[in-house]
C-alpha cells in the first residue's frame, strides 16, 4: 500500500477576514522567487486553516524563517501558533518534507475574528482625530505600554491576547503596534532579535517594531515602554535610530529591516528632554516645563553616562534639585524621588 501525506482543512473559511487583510509585503519582497512561492503557499494554507504545506524544498530553519516572516507581514492572524512542526515522510527512497501548522480558536474562529475586529476598532477609531503620524504612533505606544500587562506566563503570542485579555508578551506588543500603525496607513515592520546583556552578549529573544514617518524609518519597543516599578510609561525606545537601539538590543539580521539613522524624532528630542551636555540651567528649564505641563513623573535622557553622572551629582548629591523646586512659581511639591537607568542613559523623576 502506498503511503501518502494528506493535508486537510480543519476549518473552512470562505472569505478572508478583515484581520488578515491588514498587512504589508515587506518580508515577502526580501525573498527570491522560490521563497516567495513557499510564502504564498503558507499564506493560502493559513487562511484556509489547512493542516500543512507538503513538498517543501527547504530545511526546517528556513521554513520557520519564511513562516515567521509571513506572520510578520500579517500581524492580525491570531489563530495559528508562531512555531511550526517540520515533518519528513519517507516513501521508499524518496523523502517528502512538510510544514505542519498548529491552530487555535478552532471552535469559534469566525466569531472570534469579528470580536477581534470590534475590540481593535474601539481603540483605533480614536486615532482618526489626529492628522500627524508621530502623534498617532505616540498614542499607540502609550496605550500598549500603559494598559497591557506583560506576562511571561502567558503563552499566547498573538494580538488576540493583547486586545481580548489585556495580557501579552513582546510578540503581542509588537504585532499590535504594527497592526494599529498599518490600519492608519503608516508603514510598519516587525524586528526580530534579542535583548543585549551588559557584557554585550545575547539575552532573551525579543520582538519589537519599526514604523515610517515621512521618508524615514524608526524603531519602537512598546514592551520596554513599561516601567517595572510603577504604571508610568518609558519613552526611551520610541522613534529611535538603529544605532541607539543597538546599545540595548541585538537585531537578528536573518529578518531584513529598513535602515533607521535618525534620532531627531525621538520622544526626548521632541519634548526637549534630551541633554547633550549637562548644565543646571538646562535641567531647570526641563523641570519647569514638566511642572507646567503637569508631568509629575517624567524622564530625561543623556548623551552619555558621564553626563548623567554629572547631573546626579549636582541634582541629588549637592541637592540642587531641591533649590530648583523652590524657585518654581506655584509649585506645591512635597517630595520627590529619582531612578537612574544606565542601560538607557535615562533618569526618571517622580514628584508628589
Whereabouts are the PLM-identified features?
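Hydrophobic/aromatic-rich core segments of domains that either
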Residues: 172-244
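Sec-dependent N-terminal signal peptides of Gram-positive bacterial secreted proteins and lipoproteins
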Residues: 2-21
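Solvent-exposed loop/turn segments at secondary-structure junctions
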Residues: 106-107, 146-150, 168-170, 195-199, ...
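Secondary-structure boundary elements
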Residues: 107-162
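N-terminal accessory/pre-domain segments preceding catalytic cores
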Residues: 20-131, 246-352
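A short, highly charged nucleic-acid-interacting micro-segment common to nuclease
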Residues: 159-173
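Membrane-interface junctions
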Residues: 3, 129, 166-169
